[in-house]
Amino acid sequence: MPININKFILDMERFDGTLKKYPEDFIVEEITPEGTVLEVGKEIGFEDVEKWHGSFIHFTVEKTNWNTMDALKQIVRTTKTKRKNFGFAGTKDKFAVTTQRFGCFGLKKEQLENINIKDIVIRDVQKSNKKLRMGDLWGNKFTIKIRGLDLSKKEIKRISDLKLDYVLNYYGIQRFGLIRPITHIVGKFIYERDFESAFYTYCGTPISETGDSLEARQLVDVGEFKKALKLFNRNHDYEKRLIQQYLKYKDFKMAFTALPPQLNSMFVNAYQAYLFNEMINKRFEYGFDAKEGDILEDNTPTGTLIGYNTEFSGGIQGEIEKEIVERENLDLKKFKIEDFGNFYGTRRKMITPIYDFKSSFENDIFELSFKLERGNYATIVTREFTGNLS
């Protein structure tokens, strides 16, 4: 089951290079709703609210080689509090240097300021009366280095002269799984209420594993769950939770209740994203200028994230959307899934602007800098040059 990312905006010969050789090669700086860039290594000095009700504290987390969820787990463990006391505006990947805002309640500023975790810096601690929620950001600024290029001066000039004002608004590989792109497959099985297949796909189905991880997944595939548990390491916490819950209740659907609700939602979201990416591919041949029947956002055609309350476009775009629904044999009402969530069916722009795009060459390194609105993926920009998603 592909992830449906196969069209390009730039008409060019793409070059080979190494992305993310070091975490410092991929810098992600969150941008607040007010437009403030949380710059690496820089104190912002957010002001406390005048009349604090003693509820919420917001703070910036700068981290190297930590993803959002793992960093949060460590912060929770260090402060000896509960996961539900924390929130964040957006998620960030692991192999990078990233900044982002977190929020919490039930803690003192001093507790946060005194946290000492390797490769994590906490600063800009601010008293607030507002809960920080997912989506409370404008977007992100990216500074990316692609190494190991062997290009002629002519090729360098050609690439340096390229202007990239927008990209196809694909969901990136992160939505489906960087190492094991199976999240959308699990999501499809959950939509179909085939929880057994969802379980085996997530816990078994080895793809690129080696060693104990490979053997553990092979054991899952043949039903040797207890043996698999002994081989999965701490990097496979969710697999272990699923298996332990299944062994306790002997029920595949019940097993998924051991996972965080956000993760269970992400499975179905990934299936929606997979279908959306296909809409972009099908719309590509017709162009992305507004056409009769389009539902527009900022004068840009949108596609539907198929859900229980989907509003179909008219015209060509509507035909594309309905064709995919019919091929997948989807019953929209089934996107209300007990214990997993109600997946409404929003819309998303099929192309997205790039802001403040800059590029430069130095020695064998191509450096890109740009800003994207929230929900958009930097790897979709870099693949325009390299052709690769990772």
Swiss-Prot record:
The gene is truD. Residues 166-353 form the TRUD domain. The keyword tRNA processing applies. It holds the Pfam family TruD. Keywords: Isomerase, tRNA processing. Could be responsible for synthesis of pseudouridine from uracil-13 in transfer RNAs. The active site is at 93 (nucleophile). It comes from Methanococcus maripaludis (strain C5 / ATCC BAA-1333). This is Probable tRNA pseudouridine synthase D. Signal peptide: none annotated. Belongs to the pseudouridine synthase TruD family.
